[in-house]
Regions:
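Conserved N-terminal beta1-alpha1 strand-loop-helix module at the mouth
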Residues: 1-112
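Structural motif
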Residues: 90, 115-117, 140
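Short beta-strand/loop segments at the ligand-binding rim of alpha/beta enzyme cores
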Residues: 109-116, 152
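Conserved small/polar residues in nucleotide/adenosyl-binding loops
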Residues: 150-157
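Short, structured coil segments at secondary-structure junctions
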Residues: 110, 132-133
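Active-site-adjacent beta->alpha loops and helix N-cap segments on the catalytic face
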Residues: 93-106, 122-126, 142-149
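"…together with the soluble PPM/PP2C metallo-phosphatase catalytic core" -> "…together
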Residues: 129
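Glycine-rich phosphate-binding active-site loops on the catalytic face of alpha/beta enzymes
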Residues: 134-144
């Protein structure tokens, strides 16, 4: 892993520990038993002439702030009107300025499938994605070594791709 990826993953582990202390995984699982209808990323990309995955991101570690007060209920509909097939929403707060609330804000405003883009290292995050309405999650291979996802149930079991 790169130095920045190591730093992000270390921070993500602490963040997830704090989240688990506030909201148990059992509670997330119970609230994910009746997930909202999912939108197929594969079907959307296959049917699209562009195949564009548009990304909602406020900042990046390398570039700094892109648009600090970008609103997830306003920008994603513009991406859809411009022809995007899928919407990728960064939910990492510390390094990218995102939040799970961004998926909740965008979902009712668009008909596109939504990809939760984050550093997924624990099945807890899959249940979070299910609850907020993500249709898929991004898995970064370099971040998956020695993580808890290897023992997780299939994402299809929870209706998240």
């Amino acid at each position: 892993m790169t130095d920045i990826l190591d730093e992000i993953i270390a921070h993500k582990r602490l963040e997830i520990e704090q989240q688990k202390a506030a909201i148990s995984q059992e509670l997330l699982i119970n609230n994910c038993n009746e997930p909202m209808p999912r939108r197929s990323m594969r079907a959307s990309l296959s049917a699209s002439p562009s195949g564009i995955i548009a990304e909602f991101k406020r900042r990046s570690p390398s570039k700094g702030w892109i648009k600090e007060n970008a609103q997830a209920d306003i920008i994603p509909p513009a991406y859809e009107m411009a022809g995007a097939s899928v919407l990728s929403i960064l939910t990492d707060e510390n390094f990218f300025g995102g939040n799970l609330k961004d998926i909740r804000a965008a979902r009712p405003q668009v008909s596109l499938p939504i990809l939760r883009k984050d550093f997924i290292i624990d099945e807890y995050q899959l249940y979070q994605a299910c609850i907020v309405g993500a249709d898929a999650v991004l898995l970064i291979a370099a971040a998956l070594r020695n993580c808890l996802l290897y023992t997780s149930p299939s994402p299809r079991d929870r209706s998240v791709s």
